[in-house]
Amino acid sequence: AQALNLTQSAVSQKIKRLEQSVGGPVMVRTKPLRATPLGKELLAHIQKVSVLEEALNIQSGLEASAAPISIAVNNDVLATWYSQVMAAFSDKRANPIHIVNADQTQTRDILQQGRVMACISQTGTPVTGGQSIRLGTMRYQLYASPRFIERYLHKEISPQSVMSTPGLLYDEYDVTLLTDYQRECLNIAPSFTTCHWYPSSHGFVKMALDGVVWALLPTLQVEQEVNEGDLVPLFPQKELGVPLFWHWTTLESAALADLTKAVKNIAKAQLK
């Protein structure tokens, strides 16, 4: 209300009229306010229209404000190389990037729902009305600190002995990644009974460094820690590769095209 120089009552009336117009509630009236699924779709639609209006104004020689671009990106990419994408894009464009944080198995669905304009996913098939390109492969290994190895694995390091010690999962979606590693790399049945859940990318690495757990981590994220001997790959020859794809909605937007170019260039340098 303050931003629009309106009374709270006037804002409430505008929201009610909007909800009547679109045929459903657009927000959950809690503190803080949350958008409903319909509200999220409406917001994404407004952002897409803003991006198109920006492109049209530029083509017409009119002054154009930089419209936000909403995307969905997973934790491991955010923790490793996506900040470089932001830097490269910001050198050319002033468009704010609004990032929805979601697992790489979920980001494509978010794009399909219309909540974002682009995403990074482990699935390559484009969404309806969109395009996709392969970026490369994110590689994962199982790591632990020398302290952890001395405490729990001083007798032997085997798949069975490791899985009987404290491990780490980020959240419920991380189960899929660890399951793939256990089956494809270690040739064992999935087991999570000794795993803590700790949904923090920085904290994930810290827990492993502190000798609390073993952790399945992107090799990109812990190169320095491995080189300095603070983390040790438990099975150096066992590496899980996760393919990553960039998806985007087909829009006539130079800003989105520049973001796509930045993603491709940085991914080419970072991913194998």
Regions found by a protein language model. Name each.
Residues N5-A10, K14:
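Helix-turn-helix DNA-binding motif, specifically the short coil turn and the N-cap/start of the second
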Residues S132-L168:
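Flexible hinge/capping segments at coil-to-helix
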Residues A66-T128:
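Central regulatory/effector-binding core of bacterial HTH transcription factors
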Residues I188-P233, E239:
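Hydrophobic hinge/microswitch elements
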Residues R17-P37:
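A short LG(V/I)-centered, amphipathic sequence patch enriched
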Residues M163-I188:
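Secondary-structure junction motif
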Residues L234-K272:
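A late-sequence structural motif
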Residues S21-V22, L42-E63, V263:
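Alpha-helical linker/hinge and terminal dimerization helices associated
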